[in-house]
Amino acid sequence: MNAKIIVCACTAAVISSVVAAVLNQPGVGPGAGARYATDAYPGFDSEDEIVKPSRKEPRLFGWINGPKKDDPASQFAYCEELIGDGDYSKAARHLDALVREWPTSSQAPEAQLKLAEILLDRLQDPDEAFSEYRYLLDFYSLQCDYNATADILYRIAGIMREEGKTILFFRFRNTVDVRRAYESCVLRAPGAVWAADAMLAIAELREEEGKALEAIKVYENLRNIHPGGVQAKTALLREARTRMEVLREYGYNRSRCRDTIDFLELAAAQSDAEAREEIVRLRGQAERMLEKEAFLAAKFYDSRTRTARSAINAYEKFLADFPAGVHAGEVKARLEELKANGGEK
């Protein structure tokens, strides 16, 4: 009985090792060298939204869209002939066909790299080039220069942001696609020298999308991950501005007002003179918004449907919180009037 158990265990171990070896072959699954950020990145796309690595499959109607040759070496040589003749579009199609048909071949990583290079440099299609360079990182991470390829990804993301997306000779702003491109860069190379700049771009693009709360998460996370850089100082000021934009929309929320004021106080203490001046001004605006909301709340009790005593209590609380506020004089005068009338209606 024990011998059977040992044999079964050995068989299972062999099978699992074989499966692992197959899955770890370049081109079959995300490579063992593929590096992803292990920490959470609030403000990025969620796990359900993120673009996950997906292996290329041979196309339908292979006799039309498939490889021209019968083996990867001949197919690669054919692609090089096309490149030499300047037929870059056809070369790109057949390089892609090689990777799809023979993903584990020794020619596949170089074919994938040449495909990405042609799309970027010859066909000038940054969107497709980004996808192909990302595929190179995900499936051939050990067969390529990982850091150099990640740098190219970041550069392409900048091109995509600057040029927009062309559809039928018209250019459109592709804010969401560009943001996701920058997120892909950070997730694949979180320690790159440009990672903080990429996060700044992501937060700014979140603002352009109208997602101020998500932008704040990115700014805050950037400051935590890269606390000593120039980007952290920039993020602090931008976060202050964005928090004020949110506060203007939700000014009736006293808790949010107080949280924003506390944040601005800390931000001012950590900023240089120029940024501090702006943040102090923003804090003054937040304090006036809080006072105005408290004043309107106090006036709510000063009506015919409420007793004078409830109005007096509300006004006294307002003066305790804002003794030197803009509305303090008006509140004191009304308070004296209510008390002069006996404090009851």
Residue ranges and their predicted role:
Residues 2, 6-8, 18-345:
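Acidic, polar-rich low-complexity tracts and alpha-helical solenoid repeat scaffolds
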Residues 12-16:
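Alpha-helical oligomerization interfaces
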